[in-house]
């Protein structure tokens, strides 16, 4: 596949936040912002993918006009950022999470 053909086939770019795209908790570099804009200009969806919950994605990302979706909770939820509503979830049941927490508590 030629490089130009591969570029045309890209439909979505998902990116991690902590220690990669962001510096600190909520600082987006100008270089990263420009790269996201360039992808958006090429009709590529630009999607943050993070272990964070939706409300902890910083405004420096959610206020960008081209950030429409976000994958949160380590892949457990997909959000429509513009509508601020969850599109789908696949979360661990609370009782299972509590059982796991209890196991780890024994190792503190």
Report the location of each language-model feature.
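Non-catalytic pre-domain segments flanking phosphatase-related domains
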Residues: 1-15
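Conserved ATPase-coupling elements of RecA-like P-loop NTPase cores
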Residues: 24-28
């Amino acid at each position: 596949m030629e490089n130009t053909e591969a570029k045309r086939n890209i439909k979505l770019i998902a990116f991690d936040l902590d220690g990669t795209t962001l510096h600190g908790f909520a600082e987006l570099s100008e270089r990263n912002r420009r790269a996201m804009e360039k992808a958006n200009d090429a009709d590529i969806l630009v999607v943050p993918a993070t272990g964070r919950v939706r409300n902890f994605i910083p405004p420096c990302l959610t206020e960008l006009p081209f950030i429409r979706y976000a994958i949160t909770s380590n892949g457990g939820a997909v959000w429509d950022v513009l509508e601020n509503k969850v599109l789908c979830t696949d979360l661990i049941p609370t009782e299972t999470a509590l059982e796991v927490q209890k196991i780890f508590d024994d190792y503190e």
